[in-house]
C-alpha cells in the first residue's frame, strides 16, 4: 500500500528504516501478476502437448477433467501453482477454472492475492450442471469474498466456443 509520495530527504526523515540492507548485486522489484491462469491445470502439465487447441481440449483435456475433477484436485493443483508462482516472483493471479470456491479458499489460506473468475460454460462439470447453476454458485462465491483483502471475483465466461449468445 502506498502511504506517501515525498522527496527522498523527507521520506527518509519521516520513514526512517530500522535496518538497512545493502544488496549491490541485486534488484528489488514489485511482485509480478499472472493475468491469465488455469492454475489447477498444473496437474495436467504434459498431457497431450503440441496439439491444436480444439483436439487438445475435446479429445484429451476435457475427458481427463471429467474423470479427475474434484475439490481436492483443485486445491492440490492450486497449491502447486502458487508455490511455483511465488518461486518465480509472481504474487498475484487472475484465475479462471472450475470450483472457484475452493480456489478462493486455497489462495486465501496461502496468503496469495488473486482475482478468481466465476466460470460460465455451456456444459456440465463436477462444479455445476447448467448455466443457471454456474451463475447462482458464482454469485455465492462472489458474496463470500466481497470484502476479502486478498481475493476478489470476476465473471468469467470461458470462450466464444463454449458459451451461447444468451
Please report, for each region that a protein language model flagged, where it lies by residue.
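Conserved beta-strand segments that form the floor/walls of ligand-binding pockets within enzyme
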Residues: 28, 34, 154
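Histidine-rich, glycine-flanked metal-binding segment
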Residues: 1-29
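Histidine-centered catalytic micro-motifs
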Residues: 31-42
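Hydrophobic/aromatic beta-strand patches that form the interior of the parallel beta-sheet core
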Residues: 19-21, 33, 115
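Divalent metal-binding segments
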Residues: 2, 24, 28, 51-99, ...
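Metal-coordinating catalytic core of metallo-dependent amide/deamination hydrolases
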Residues: 102-166
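Active-site gating loops and adjacent loop-to-helix segments of metal-dependent hydrolytic enzymes
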Residues: 43-76, 113-132
Amino acid at each position: 500500500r502506498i502511504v506517501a509520495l515525498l522527496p527522498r530527504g523527507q521520506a527518509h526523515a519521516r520513514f526512517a528504516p530500522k535496518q538497512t540492507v545493502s544488496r549491490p548485486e541485486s534488484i528489488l522489484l514489485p511482485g509480478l501478476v499472472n493475468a491469465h491462469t488455469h492454475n489447477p491445470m498444473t496437474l495436467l502439465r504434459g498431457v497431450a502437448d503440441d496439439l491444436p487447441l480444439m483436439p487438445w481440449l475435446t479429445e484429451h483435456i476435457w475427458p481427463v477433467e471429467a474423470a479427475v475433477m474434484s475439490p481436492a484436485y483443485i486445491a492440490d493443483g492450486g497449491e502447486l501453482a502458487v508455490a511455483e508462482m511465488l518461486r518465480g516472483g509472481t504474487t498475484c493471479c487472475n484465475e479462471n477454472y472450475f470450483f472457484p470456491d475452493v480456489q478462493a479458499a486455497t489462495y486465501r489460506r496461502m496468503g496469495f492475492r488473486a482475482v478468481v473468475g466465476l466460470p460460465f460454460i455451456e456444459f456440465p462439470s463436477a462444479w455445476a450442471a447448467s448455466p443457471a447453476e454456474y451463475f447462482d454458485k458464482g454469485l455465492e462465491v462472489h458474496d463470500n469474498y466481497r470484502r476479502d483483502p486478498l481475493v476478489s471475483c470476476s465473471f468469467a465466461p470461458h470462450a466464444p466456443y463454449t458459451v451461447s449468445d444468451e
